[in-house]
A protein has these predicted regions:
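A short macromolecule-binding patch
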Residues: 311-322
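Extracytoplasmic cell-surface/polysaccharide-interacting catalytic and binding patches
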Residues: 19-146, 160-241, 247-264
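Short, well-ordered surface patches within globular domains
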Residues: 154
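Segments that shape or occlude catalytic/ligand-binding pockets
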Residues: 151
Protein backbone atom coordinates (compact mmCIF):
# COMPACT_ATOMS: atom_id res chain seq x y z
CA UNK A 1 0.00 0.00 0.00
CA UNK A 2 2.79 2.41 0.93
CA UNK A 3 4.61 1.64 -2.33
CA UNK A 4 1.40 2.52 -4.25
CA UNK A 5 0.99 5.78 -2.31
CA UNK A 6 4.63 6.63 -2.99
CA UNK A 7 4.11 5.98 -6.70
CA UNK A 8 0.97 8.20 -6.79
CA UNK A 9 2.75 11.04 -5.00
CA UNK A 10 5.67 10.76 -7.41
CA UNK A 11 3.27 10.83 -10.38
CA UNK A 12 1.54 14.02 -9.23
CA UNK A 13 4.87 15.63 -8.38
CA UNK A 14 6.15 14.99 -11.88
CA UNK A 15 2.85 16.22 -13.36
CA UNK A 16 2.97 19.49 -11.45
CA UNK A 17 6.65 20.07 -12.24
CA UNK A 18 6.10 19.55 -15.97
CA UNK A 19 8.44 16.58 -16.14
CA UNK A 20 7.77 13.76 -18.54
CA UNK A 21 9.20 10.26 -19.09
CA UNK A 22 10.43 9.01 -22.45
CA UNK A 23 11.17 5.26 -22.44
CA UNK A 24 14.65 4.40 -23.63
CA UNK A 25 15.60 1.72 -26.11
CA UNK A 26 17.62 -0.26 -23.63
CA UNK A 27 16.31 -2.14 -20.60
CA UNK A 28 18.12 -1.22 -17.39
CA UNK A 29 19.74 -4.09 -15.54
CA UNK A 30 18.14 -5.37 -12.37
CA UNK A 31 21.08 -4.09 -10.32
CA UNK A 32 20.48 -0.54 -11.59
CA UNK A 33 16.74 -0.80 -10.98
CA UNK A 34 17.23 -2.35 -7.53
CA UNK A 35 19.53 0.46 -6.43
CA UNK A 36 16.80 3.01 -7.27
CA UNK A 37 14.02 1.31 -5.29
CA UNK A 38 12.82 3.32 -2.28
CA UNK A 39 13.27 1.66 1.08
CA UNK A 40 10.02 0.44 2.59
CA UNK A 41 9.21 0.81 6.28
CA UNK A 42 9.44 -2.32 8.39
CA UNK A 43 5.68 -2.75 8.75
CA UNK A 44 5.33 -3.26 4.98
CA UNK A 45 7.39 -6.45 5.05
CA UNK A 46 5.87 -9.89 5.53
CA UNK A 47 8.44 -12.69 5.63
CA UNK A 48 7.79 -15.97 3.86
CA UNK A 49 8.95 -17.63 7.06
CA UNK A 50 5.41 -17.10 8.32
CA UNK A 51 4.54 -20.04 6.06
CA UNK A 52 6.68 -22.13 8.39
CA UNK A 53 5.37 -20.56 11.60
CA UNK A 54 8.77 -19.02 12.32
CA UNK A 55 9.56 -15.54 13.52
CA UNK A 56 10.16 -13.19 10.61
CA UNK A 57 13.69 -11.84 10.30
CA UNK A 58 14.48 -8.17 9.85
CA UNK A 59 15.55 -7.54 6.25
CA UNK A 60 18.99 -6.05 5.98
CA UNK A 61 20.02 -3.26 3.62
CA UNK A 62 23.46 -1.82 2.82
CA UNK A 63 24.79 0.50 5.50
CA UNK A 64 26.60 3.35 3.79
CA UNK A 65 28.33 4.28 7.06
CA UNK A 66 30.11 0.91 7.15
CA UNK A 67 33.10 0.52 4.83
CA UNK A 68 34.10 -2.90 3.57
CA UNK A 69 37.87 -3.22 3.74
CA UNK A 70 39.12 -4.69 0.48
CA UNK A 71 41.80 -7.35 1.05
CA UNK A 72 44.79 -7.24 -1.26
CA UNK A 73 45.41 -10.53 -3.07
CA UNK A 74 48.09 -10.54 -5.76
CA UNK A 75 47.61 -13.57 -8.01
CA UNK A 76 51.15 -13.15 -9.34
CA UNK A 77 52.47 -13.89 -5.86
CA UNK A 78 50.30 -17.00 -5.42
CA UNK A 79 51.41 -20.51 -6.47
CA UNK A 80 50.74 -21.20 -10.14
CA UNK A 81 47.54 -23.25 -10.54
CA UNK A 82 45.71 -25.01 -13.33
CA UNK A 83 41.98 -24.26 -13.81
CA UNK A 84 40.94 -27.64 -12.40
CA UNK A 85 43.15 -27.56 -9.30
CA UNK A 86 41.45 -27.48 -5.91
CA UNK A 87 42.38 -24.42 -3.85
CA UNK A 88 41.30 -22.97 -0.51
CA UNK A 89 38.76 -20.22 -1.16
CA UNK A 90 39.84 -17.90 1.68
CA UNK A 91 43.40 -17.84 0.34
CA UNK A 92 41.97 -15.83 -2.57
CA UNK A 93 38.95 -14.10 -0.98
CA UNK A 94 39.92 -13.47 2.67
CA UNK A 95 36.80 -11.44 3.44
CA UNK A 96 34.29 -14.05 2.29
CA UNK A 97 32.08 -15.31 5.12
CA UNK A 98 32.12 -19.08 5.67
CA UNK A 99 29.55 -21.07 7.62
CA UNK A 100 29.62 -24.62 6.29
CA UNK A 101 26.31 -26.10 7.39
CA UNK A 102 27.37 -29.71 6.81
CA UNK A 103 30.46 -29.32 8.98
CA UNK A 104 28.04 -29.10 11.92
CA UNK A 105 24.86 -30.90 12.93
CA UNK A 106 22.83 -27.77 12.12
CA UNK A 107 21.45 -29.11 8.84
CA UNK A 108 18.52 -31.20 7.65
CA UNK A 109 20.29 -34.49 8.48
CA UNK A 110 20.96 -33.53 12.10
CA UNK A 111 24.51 -34.88 11.84
CA UNK A 112 28.00 -33.77 10.81
CA UNK A 113 28.33 -34.68 7.13
CA UNK A 114 32.02 -33.79 6.65
CA UNK A 115 34.82 -32.94 9.05
CA UNK A 116 36.46 -29.89 7.48
CA UNK A 117 35.64 -26.20 7.91
CA UNK A 118 37.47 -24.60 4.98
CA UNK A 119 35.96 -24.13 1.52
CA UNK A 120 37.75 -25.87 -1.36
CA UNK A 121 36.82 -25.28 -5.01
CA UNK A 122 38.33 -25.48 -8.49
CA UNK A 123 40.73 -22.66 -9.26
CA UNK A 124 38.64 -21.44 -12.21
CA UNK A 125 35.58 -21.30 -9.94
CA UNK A 126 37.45 -19.26 -7.33
CA UNK A 127 38.64 -16.73 -9.93
CA UNK A 128 35.03 -16.10 -10.97
CA UNK A 129 33.96 -15.75 -7.34
CA UNK A 130 36.66 -13.11 -6.87
CA UNK A 131 34.90 -11.02 -9.53
CA UNK A 132 31.52 -11.62 -7.88
CA UNK A 133 32.84 -10.52 -4.49
CA UNK A 134 34.46 -7.41 -5.98
CA UNK A 135 31.15 -6.27 -7.49
CA UNK A 136 29.21 -7.04 -4.32
CA UNK A 137 31.63 -4.97 -2.23
CA UNK A 138 30.77 -1.93 -4.33
CA UNK A 139 27.11 -2.42 -3.36
CA UNK A 140 27.88 -2.92 0.34
CA UNK A 141 27.58 -6.71 0.36
CA UNK A 142 29.68 -9.86 0.56
CA UNK A 143 29.10 -13.53 -0.10
CA UNK A 144 28.44 -16.04 2.66
CA UNK A 145 29.16 -19.70 1.86
CA UNK A 146 26.95 -22.48 3.22
CA UNK A 147 28.36 -25.37 1.19
CA UNK A 148 30.85 -25.98 -1.61
CA UNK A 149 32.86 -29.08 -2.56
CA UNK A 150 31.58 -32.34 -1.08
CA UNK A 151 33.51 -35.62 -1.20
CA UNK A 152 31.45 -38.56 -2.45
CA UNK A 153 31.30 -39.92 1.10
CA UNK A 154 29.49 -36.74 2.17
CA UNK A 155 27.14 -36.90 -0.80
CA UNK A 156 26.25 -40.46 0.16
CA UNK A 157 25.26 -39.33 3.67
CA UNK A 158 22.96 -36.66 2.25
CA UNK A 159 21.36 -39.11 -0.19
CA UNK A 160 20.72 -41.61 2.59
CA UNK A 161 19.05 -38.85 4.63
CA UNK A 162 16.82 -37.65 1.74
CA UNK A 163 16.84 -39.95 -1.33
CA UNK A 164 14.93 -37.53 -3.55
CA UNK A 165 16.76 -36.57 -6.78
CA UNK A 166 14.80 -33.31 -7.00
CA UNK A 167 16.75 -32.02 -4.00
CA UNK A 168 19.73 -34.35 -3.41
CA UNK A 169 21.81 -35.93 -6.16
CA UNK A 170 22.34 -39.69 -6.05
CA UNK A 171 26.10 -40.10 -5.44
CA UNK A 172 26.31 -43.09 -7.78
CA UNK A 173 23.98 -42.15 -10.65
CA UNK A 174 23.28 -38.41 -10.32
CA UNK A 175 25.06 -35.32 -11.60
CA UNK A 176 26.71 -34.63 -8.20
CA UNK A 177 27.55 -31.03 -9.00
CA UNK A 178 28.94 -30.38 -5.51
CA UNK A 179 31.32 -33.34 -5.93
CA UNK A 180 32.77 -31.75 -9.07
CA UNK A 181 34.20 -28.79 -7.17
CA UNK A 182 32.58 -26.07 -9.29
CA UNK A 183 29.36 -25.57 -7.30
CA UNK A 184 28.66 -23.39 -4.29
CA UNK A 185 25.70 -22.58 -2.03
CA UNK A 186 25.73 -18.89 -1.07
CA UNK A 187 23.72 -16.02 0.32
CA UNK A 188 24.38 -12.32 0.85
CA UNK A 189 25.50 -10.51 3.99
CA UNK A 190 25.76 -6.76 4.46
CA UNK A 191 28.93 -4.87 5.33
CA UNK A 192 28.48 -5.75 9.00
CA UNK A 193 28.21 -9.46 8.22
CA UNK A 194 24.47 -9.87 8.80
CA UNK A 195 22.48 -12.02 6.41
CA UNK A 196 19.95 -10.18 4.26
CA UNK A 197 16.40 -11.45 3.87
CA UNK A 198 16.01 -14.21 1.27
CA UNK A 199 13.00 -16.32 0.15
CA UNK A 200 13.86 -19.12 2.62
CA UNK A 201 16.64 -20.42 4.79
CA UNK A 202 19.22 -22.94 3.58
CA UNK A 203 18.09 -26.43 2.52
CA UNK A 204 14.40 -25.57 2.50
CA UNK A 205 12.81 -28.36 0.46
CA UNK A 206 9.56 -26.48 -0.16
CA UNK A 207 8.52 -24.62 -3.31
CA UNK A 208 9.27 -21.33 -1.53
CA UNK A 209 12.98 -21.99 -2.22
CA UNK A 210 12.64 -22.00 -6.02
CA UNK A 211 13.44 -19.11 -8.35
CA UNK A 212 9.83 -18.09 -8.93
CA UNK A 213 10.07 -15.38 -6.23
CA UNK A 214 6.33 -14.64 -6.44
CA UNK A 215 5.60 -16.22 -3.05
CA UNK A 216 8.02 -14.18 -0.93
CA UNK A 217 8.37 -10.57 0.18
CA UNK A 218 9.54 -7.82 -2.15
CA UNK A 219 12.74 -7.51 -0.11
CA UNK A 220 13.52 -11.23 -0.31
CA UNK A 221 12.80 -11.31 -4.04
CA UNK A 222 14.98 -8.25 -4.68
CA UNK A 223 17.91 -9.70 -2.73
CA UNK A 224 17.68 -13.10 -4.42
CA UNK A 225 17.44 -11.50 -7.87
CA UNK A 226 20.42 -9.27 -7.13
CA UNK A 227 22.49 -12.31 -6.17
CA UNK A 228 21.31 -14.19 -9.25
CA UNK A 229 22.13 -11.39 -11.68
CA UNK A 230 25.66 -10.90 -10.37
CA UNK A 231 26.42 -14.63 -10.21
CA UNK A 232 25.16 -15.17 -13.77
CA UNK A 233 27.10 -12.14 -15.00
CA UNK A 234 30.34 -13.75 -13.83
CA UNK A 235 29.80 -17.23 -15.23
CA UNK A 236 27.50 -19.14 -12.88
CA UNK A 237 24.15 -20.82 -13.45
CA UNK A 238 21.55 -21.27 -10.72
CA UNK A 239 19.53 -24.37 -9.86
CA UNK A 240 15.81 -23.76 -10.38
CA UNK A 241 14.68 -25.39 -7.13
CA UNK A 242 17.28 -23.70 -4.86
CA UNK A 243 17.88 -19.94 -4.91
CA UNK A 244 21.24 -20.39 -3.10
CA UNK A 245 22.78 -23.00 -5.48
CA UNK A 246 25.16 -21.93 -8.30
CA UNK A 247 27.43 -23.90 -10.64
CA UNK A 248 30.30 -22.47 -12.66
CA UNK A 249 29.93 -22.78 -16.43
CA UNK A 250 33.20 -24.74 -16.74
CA UNK A 251 32.38 -28.43 -16.37
CA UNK A 252 34.54 -30.92 -14.46
CA UNK A 253 34.44 -34.63 -13.74
CA UNK A 254 33.32 -35.86 -10.35
CA UNK A 255 36.30 -35.78 -7.98
CA UNK A 256 36.91 -39.23 -6.52
CA UNK A 257 40.25 -38.70 -4.75
CA UNK A 258 40.55 -35.28 -3.15
CA UNK A 259 39.00 -35.07 0.31
CA UNK A 260 39.60 -31.91 2.41
CA UNK A 261 39.04 -34.01 5.53
CA UNK A 262 42.29 -35.87 4.82
CA UNK A 263 44.45 -32.83 4.09
CA UNK A 264 47.61 -33.12 6.22
CA UNK A 265 51.36 -32.50 6.15
CA UNK A 266 53.73 -35.40 5.46
CA UNK A 267 57.43 -35.79 4.62
CA UNK A 268 59.46 -38.00 2.34
CA UNK A 269 61.11 -40.91 4.16
CA UNK A 270 63.68 -42.61 1.94
CA UNK A 271 67.41 -42.89 1.23
CA UNK A 272 67.62 -40.04 -1.29
CA UNK A 273 64.29 -39.03 -2.86
CA UNK A 274 60.84 -40.24 -3.88
CA UNK A 275 59.22 -39.79 -7.27
CA UNK A 276 56.19 -37.58 -7.80
CA UNK A 277 54.27 -39.23 -10.64
CA UNK A 278 51.54 -38.08 -12.99
CA UNK A 279 49.26 -41.01 -12.06
CA UNK A 280 49.05 -43.64 -9.27
CA UNK A 281 51.25 -46.20 -10.99
CA UNK A 282 54.90 -47.14 -10.37
CA UNK A 283 55.62 -46.94 -14.10
CA UNK A 284 53.90 -43.57 -14.64
CA UNK A 285 55.79 -40.50 -15.84
CA UNK A 286 57.82 -38.73 -13.14
CA UNK A 287 56.94 -35.05 -12.71
CA UNK A 288 59.71 -34.28 -10.21
CA UNK A 289 61.54 -35.78 -7.26
CA UNK A 290 61.08 -35.01 -3.56
CA UNK A 291 64.31 -35.18 -1.50
CA UNK A 292 64.34 -37.13 1.75
CA UNK A 293 62.72 -35.30 4.67
CA UNK A 294 61.09 -32.64 2.46
CA UNK A 295 57.48 -31.88 3.36
CA UNK A 296 54.34 -31.90 1.20
CA UNK A 297 50.56 -31.75 1.58
CA UNK A 298 48.48 -34.91 1.19
CA UNK A 299 45.17 -34.21 -0.55
CA UNK A 300 43.81 -37.75 -0.89
CA UNK A 301 44.55 -41.45 -1.24
CA UNK A 302 44.12 -44.08 -3.96
CA UNK A 303 45.41 -47.65 -4.36
CA UNK A 304 48.46 -47.33 -2.09
CA UNK A 305 49.38 -43.88 -3.44
CA UNK A 306 48.96 -40.45 -1.92
CA UNK A 307 47.73 -37.58 -4.06
CA UNK A 308 49.86 -34.64 -2.94
CA UNK A 309 50.84 -31.04 -3.52
CA UNK A 310 54.59 -30.42 -3.48
CA UNK A 311 55.63 -26.79 -3.97
CA UNK A 312 52.70 -26.16 -6.32
CA UNK A 313 53.09 -29.39 -8.31
CA UNK A 314 50.43 -32.06 -7.82
CA UNK A 315 50.80 -35.76 -8.41
CA UNK A 316 51.09 -39.18 -6.78
CA UNK A 317 53.72 -40.71 -4.51
CA UNK A 318 54.08 -44.23 -3.15
CA UNK A 319 52.59 -44.22 0.36
CA UNK A 320 55.28 -46.63 1.61
CA UNK A 321 57.94 -43.91 1.51
CA UNK A 322 56.42 -41.16 3.61
CA UNK A 323 55.53 -40.34 7.22
CA UNK A 324 53.09 -37.91 8.77
CA UNK A 325 54.28 -34.63 10.27
CA UNK A 326 50.92 -33.18 11.40
Amino acid sequence: MRRKLTALLLFFTLLLSGCCYAPGNERASFVESWLKLPALPMEDYQSTKEHHNEEAETPSTPNESVTIEVPVVNLDEMPKREPGDFVKLRDYIPDIVVELKYATSSNFTGQVVYDFTEVYLRYSTVLKLMDVQAELRELGYRLKVWDAFRPLTAQEKLWNAKPDPQYVSNPWTGTNSHSRGNTIDVTLVNAEGREVEMPTGFDDFSTYADRDYSDCTDAAAANAMLLQEIMEKHGFKGLQTEWWHYTENTDYDIEKIFDPGTVSIWRAECNEYINLRVSPNVSAEVLTTIPDNNQFTVLGWINGFAYIDYQGTRGYVNADYMSRVE
